[in-house]
């Protein structure tokens, strides 16, 4: 028992779904394993009227991240005395439902030129390594005596993307054609490191107001175009060449990009300027 207690005390970050010896546990609450799931329904139909082709559909996703939300965000449930959390002040988060319409349109303007347009909304879960944390790790974050660069998130929303495309196909020879497409993509609700402004000094559970959390609040935009040259198969030879240019911009390239600014509190405001993201690949 003494060895177990000592091991438990030395393992300050704790774990989810396993005990201190690495054995799987099947229990409820913060110490139990998480079982996220996604349920999806997609309906699509195509309508043709002469040379005009319309493709319309809708996708419905129901995301269950199997995570938690705070009953009172202004008073996070830190149990300072027992070095843990008040689990009765944390409840299961709700399933998030996202409806995503999709629409495509194509029509010819001459015998050689065809225009096409597309619009769609897309949704996905945040990265699952961001929201989850054990009660021991929550204790470290809320106590404020340790710098925790990878804290936890509560009740995160799905990340949403809206995408537009417009382009044309031009058959300039009987066996050769070019495709030119311009696209724009806007992603919102991306996860970023932040604080809860609701938590004030002197809150009920004495939680450090500068405690960090993952929240939805960042965005990125991607604009660009794609040029494709293609030929039909002639004497068992077919040519296909494509070039894509894209420009990805946003405030933070990573959920933890804001960590340095937050660690300086009010001395260093969070980044607000839109910049090229470090993973952008223009060509």
Residue ranges of model-derived segments:
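Transmembrane beta-barrel architecture of outer-membrane proteins
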Residues: 36-42, 98-101, 151, 161-165, ...
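Flexible, surface-exposed loop regions and adjacent strand-edge segments
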Residues: 2-15, 70-81, 85-86, 131-140, ...
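Transmembrane beta-strands of outer-membrane beta-barrel pores
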Residues: 2, 49-51, 60-66, 119-125, ...
């Amino acid at each position: 028992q003494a060895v177990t207690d000592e091991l438990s005390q030395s393992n300050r970050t704790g774990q989810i779904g396993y005990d201190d010896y690495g054995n799987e546990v099947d229990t409820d609450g913060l110490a139990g394993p998480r079982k996220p799931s996604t349920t999806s329904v997609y309906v699509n139909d195509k309508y043709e009227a002469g040379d005009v082709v319309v493709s319309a559909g809708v996708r419905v996703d129901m995301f269950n991240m199997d995570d938690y939300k705070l009953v009172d965000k202004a008073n996070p449930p830190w149990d300072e005395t027992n070095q843990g959390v008040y689990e009765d002040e944390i409840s299961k988060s709700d399933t998030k439902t996202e409806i995503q319409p999709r629409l495509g349109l194509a029509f010819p303007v001459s015998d050689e030129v065809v225009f096409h347009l597309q619009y769609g909304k897309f949704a996905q879960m945040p990265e699952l390594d961001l929201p989850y944390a054990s009660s021991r790790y929550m204790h470290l974050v809320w106590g404020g005596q340790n710098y925790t660069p990878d804290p936890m998130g509560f009740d995160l929303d799905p990340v949403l993307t809206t995408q537009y495309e417009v382009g044309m196909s031009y058959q300039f020879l009987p066996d050769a054609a070019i495709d030119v497409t311009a696209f724009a993509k806007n992603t919102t609700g991306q996860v970023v490191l932040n604080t809860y402004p609701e938590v004030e000094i002197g809150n009920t559970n004495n939680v450090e107001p500068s405690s960090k959390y993952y929240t939805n609040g960042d965005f990125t935009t991607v604009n660009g175009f794609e040029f494709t040259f293609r030929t039909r198969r002639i004497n068992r030879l077919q040519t296909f060449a494509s070039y894509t240019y894209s420009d990805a911009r946003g405030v933070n390239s990573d959920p933890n990009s804001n960590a340095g600014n937050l660690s300086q509190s009010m001395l260093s405001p969070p980044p607000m300027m839109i910049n090229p993201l470090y993973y952008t690949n223009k060509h």
